[in-house]
Swiss-Prot record:
It comes from the Eukaryota. This is Phosphotriesterase-related protein. A divalent metal cation 2 binds at E169, H201, H230. Binds 2 divalent metal cations per subunit. Its cofactor is a divalent metal cation. Its EC number is 3.1.-.-. Pfam families: PTE. PROSITE patterns: PHOSPHOTRIESTERASE_1, PHOSPHOTRIESTERASE_2.
Amino acid sequence: MTAVETVLGSITPNLLGRTLTHEHVALDFEHFYRPPPADFESELKAKISMSTLGYVRLYPYSSKENVRFYDEEALEAAKKDVLLYKKHGGGSIVENSSYGLKRNLEFIVELAKSTGVHFIAGTGHYIHAVQDASHASLTVEQMSDLYTKDILTGIEIKGKMVKCGFIGEVASVYPIHEFEKNSIKATGEIQEVLGCGVSFHPHRDAQAPFDIMRLYLEAGGRAQKCVMSHLDRTLFKIEQLVELSELGCYLQYDLFGTECSYYQLNTNVDMISDGQRIENLMKLIEEGLLDRLLMSHDIHTKHRLTSYGGHGYHHIHTNILPRMFARGVTLEQVEQMTVTNPANWLSFDP
C-alpha cells in the first residue's frame, strides 16, 4: 500500500491536503551572497527594517542578514508563517533543504508537532560548492547508501528516527559538475529501487533540465516521479516547457511571490511576475499538462516572510488561487495541481 513519509511518520496520501512542493523553513544560503551596489552598501548592511526593506527587495542576496535563514529570528518568523499557512487552508509542506544547505531537521520536526502541518523532508545533495569534505568525496555507491538509509531507516533526532520522504532538492550547476553527476545518478538508481519522489534544481540555463533528465533516466529513475523545479526562471517559452514535459517529469512553478524582475543570480534574464506565472500555467493546462503541474514559493530568504514584510507560505492560497479562479481556472484544476499531483508524486511503497 502506498503512503507518504512525513517527519512524524507515514500517512495515507489523501491526508496531505493542499501541498506546497518546494519550500524551506530553515537553511544556510550565505554561499549565494552578492556584494551590494556601492550606492546602497550602507542600507544593505543595516538590519532589515521598513527604511531598508525596499533595497533588500531589489537586492535580496546582498543583505547578509537576509540570506542567514537559520538564526532564531528566522525560525520564529518561519513558524509564524507556517501557522498562517495552516490557518488559510494549507495541509502539507515539502521541505527541500538537502545536504549542503545545513537542513535543520530538528526544527522541521518541532514545526510539524506544533503547527499540525505535515512536513516531508528530503535527502540528496545540493551543488558541489556548498559540500563539506566528508560529502564532497562520496562515490555514487556511497550516495546511494546514504539516501537509502535516510528514507528507510531515518536520521536520529532526540532519540527518535525521522525518515525522509523524497530525494531533493538535488542541485547542479551548468555544465554539471562531476560530483553533481554522481548525485543525479545515485538519485536515479535509488528511485528505481524505492519508487520515491525526486526533485531537481537545475542551473539557470535552458539546457540544464534536459541534461539532468538524461542522466537521471539513464540511471534508471522514473520520469513520472521526478519534479523539475524553478522553471519560472529557467525556461521562458511554452514550447520549451512542452518539450521538457515530453520526458514525463512534473513541471514546477515555484517562485510565486517573487515580483522583482531584476534577478541577481542571473542578470541576463528578467524574472517573470506572478501574473505571467498564472498565464503560463493556464497555457500549459491548455496543452493538456494539468496532471504534470505543481506550484510553490521556494521561500529561502527572510524578506519573503511576513515578519520581514514578505508574503509568507500562504501567498498562493490567499492571493494566487483567487486570481486564477477569476481568470477561468476551475476548482477541479486547482485541486489537481495543489492536492492530487503532489500526492501522486510523494506516495510510494518502499
